[in-house]
Amino acid sequence: MLETTQALFHLGPLAVGTTVVTTWGIMVVLSLGAWLASRRLRLDPGPFQVALEGVVQTIRAAVEEVVPRRADTVFPFVATLWLFIGIANLSSLIPRVHSPTADLSATTALALLVFFSVHWFGIRIQGLRPYLRHYLSPSPFLLPFHVIGEITRTLALAVRLFGNMMSLETAALLVLLVAGLFAPIPLLMLHIVEALVQAYIFGMLTLVYIAGAIQSLEARRSPKEEET
């Protein structure tokens, strides 16, 4: 587990470790895969296109269920986050590759990305003053509690994903040491399920936080506005 923090090479004074390399590798794979998958879309899709469309439609349905009026705005960010974390969690299945999400620095970066994105969506959709005003409701005395809540949920996002993925890798290593060749297949299935579940939880929490940032505007919409 310590290998995730070891430096592979240096760029000037900056040490580049396995977490950074794996993270950039996953981003390249996702970008290249998205480009290749969208080059030759057909009305009569093959198995690969059907699978991709199924993934996209599933994520889209989840987003529409939480923020139906703002699905077009929120979907690209949440879908990208879901796919990245899912692939990152599964990357440890590759021999000698450690999942970036088993490194606290990576999960902290993801949590900070969510933190700033939530506020960005809130300000973009509501406007700066209306968005900031909701921190003073129902009483200005609750402002410190709102601020503490924002900080603690960001920390919880980072620590939850890191702790679960680190414990998953540690448990897998211990089982392999004890059970040897009898463990790989059940362990592989457990790893896949847990990796996807953790990605789902992180993405769903992000979606709920974004919905919370824009809900005051949605609540002010009249029935007539909803029809239009």
Curated annotation (Swiss-Prot):
GO BP annotation list: proton motive force-driven plasma membrane ATP synthesis
SUPFAM superfamilies per UniProt: F1F0 ATP synthase subunit A (SSF81336)
GO molecular function, one term: proton-transporting ATP synthase activity, rotational mechanism
InterPro entries: ATP_syn_F0_a_bact/chloroplast, ATP_synth_F0_asu, ATP_synth_F0_asu_AS, F0_ATP_A_sf
Keywords: ATP synthesis, Cell inner membrane, Cell membrane, CF(0), Hydrogen ion transport, Ion transport, Membrane, Transmembrane, Transmembrane helix, Transport
Membrane-spanning ranges: 16-36, 74-94, 103-123, 139-159, 173-193, 194-214
Lipid bilayer topology: Multi-pass membrane protein
Keyword Phosphoprotein among UniProt keywords: no
Places the protein is found: Cell inner membrane
One of the Pfam families matching this protein, by short name: ATP-synt_A
PROSITE patterns: ATPASE_A
Single GO cellular component term: plasma membrane
Family designation: Belongs to the ATPase A chain family.
Function noted in UniProt: Key component of the proton channel; it plays a direct role in the translocation of protons across the membrane.
Assembly with partners or alone: F-type ATPases have 2 components, CF(1) - the catalytic core - and CF(0) - the membrane proton channel. CF(1) has five subunits: alpha(3), beta(3), gamma(1), delta(1), epsilon(1). CF(0) has three main subunits: a(1), b(2) and c(9-12). The alpha and beta chains form an alternating ring which encloses part of the gamma chain. CF(1) is attached to CF(0) by a central stalk formed by the gamma and epsilon chains, while a peripheral stalk is formed by the delta and b chains.
Designated name of the protein: ATP synthase subunit a 2
Source species: Pelobacter propionicus (strain DSM 2379 / NBRC 103807 / OttBd1)
Gene that produces this protein: atpB2
